[in-house]
């Protein structure tokens, strides 16, 4: 099946938003350079994270195009799997790992955790053994680390956006109403906004 013009006008701009939203980190890093130097391990790693997060969104767009933007339980964009969908999940994981390393990479355990999750991700994705577990672990670690570094409760809205992502994705699979496709993408990609706000508020608030 294909989405109609009205649904296209809702879904496609949100995917462009998801592709471009990581770029908000770049001016924030430049403007708060000295602040970040005193708070986190390596600020320049955020630039690499932006690349991988955008690459992940691009792979997702490619897979959605192959699925004609109509997500079902059987489609690769839903609960199925494919090369592009796997690259999407892997790239997002790498981007999140790089953010965590940039925040607290001076802790040896963080390096080993990130390496371990990156190595096992392709296997558990292919086998469908808790495929969201690595992203859940690294997302939780990022949020908690950012809170202790920047002391801004706004960062906990990342948990809210994750919860909404799960709710809307499940509704999408159950109903095949593609309106939830847009909501899922919007919530899933907006977590980076709360990291941006936490750093801005901590540096300039």
Q: Where do the model's predicted regions map?
A:
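N-terminal topogenic module of multi-pass integral membrane proteins
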Residues: 1-76
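Hydrophobic cores of alpha-helical transmembrane segments in multi-pass inner/ER membrane proteins
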Residues: 15-28, 88-103, 137-145, 186-202
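Juxtamembrane "helix-exit" motif on the non-cytosolic side of transmembrane helices
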Residues: 31-34, 62-70, 122-129, 167-176
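Aromatic-anchored segments of alpha-helical transmembrane domains
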Residues: 52-59, 116-127, 160-172
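Non-cytosolic membrane-interface motifs at loop->transmembrane helix junctions
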Residues: 72-87, 132-138, 177-186
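Membrane-proximal helix-loop-helix units in multi-pass membrane proteins
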Residues: 83-151
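C-terminal transmembrane-bundle signature of multipass membrane proteins
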Residues: 149-205
